[in-house]
């Protein structure tokens, strides 16, 4: 698995729906943020799927050509803090067939996510953590 840096920020623009964490671990939110980013990335020409829940946050599948990247959105320690990162997995068959990994695609999707967040006036204190 390859992972991007983590982006953290503050925003009150992504409301938490009642019972949203029933599909994740308790206290883990981010569905509205995942949907918002999916829309913004789609407007930039990226093929994005619907937001779906995992135990660690809300995810969106992003496709560029034949490569796929997962975008993960989750809540932070306070109601208005959020974190976002991207990752890609290279399956056993990809390695066996010596297909190249999706590192370049991961970087391109991460840059697009960062650009979307940077351009949004509702996003404050955006920080990139390694």
Regions found by a protein language model. Give the residues of each.
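Aromatic-enriched hydrophobic runs in primary sequence
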Residues: 9-14, 26, 67, 95, ...
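N-terminal low-complexity, intrinsically disordered segments
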Residues: 1-36, 42, 46
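Amphipathic protein-protein interaction modules
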Residues: 55-105, 109
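Structural alpha-beta junctions
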Residues: 34, 38-47, 114-125
């Amino acid at each position: 698995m390859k992972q991007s840096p983590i982006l953290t920020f503050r925003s009150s623009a992504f409301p938490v729906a009642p019972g949203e964490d029933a599909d994740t671990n308790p206290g883990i939110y981010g569905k509205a943020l995942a949907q918002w980013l999916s829309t913004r990335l789609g407007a930039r020409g990226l093929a994005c799927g619907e937001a779906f829940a995992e135990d660690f946050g809300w995810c969106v599948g992003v496709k560029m050509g034949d490569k796929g990247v997962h975008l993960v959105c989750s809540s932070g320690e306070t109601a208005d803090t959020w974190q976002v990162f991207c990752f890609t997995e290279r399956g056993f068959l990809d390695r066996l067939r010596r297909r190249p990994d999706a590192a370049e695609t991961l970087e391109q999707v991460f840059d697009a996510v960062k650009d979307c967040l940077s351009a949004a006036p509702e996003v404050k204190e955006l920080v990139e953590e390694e």
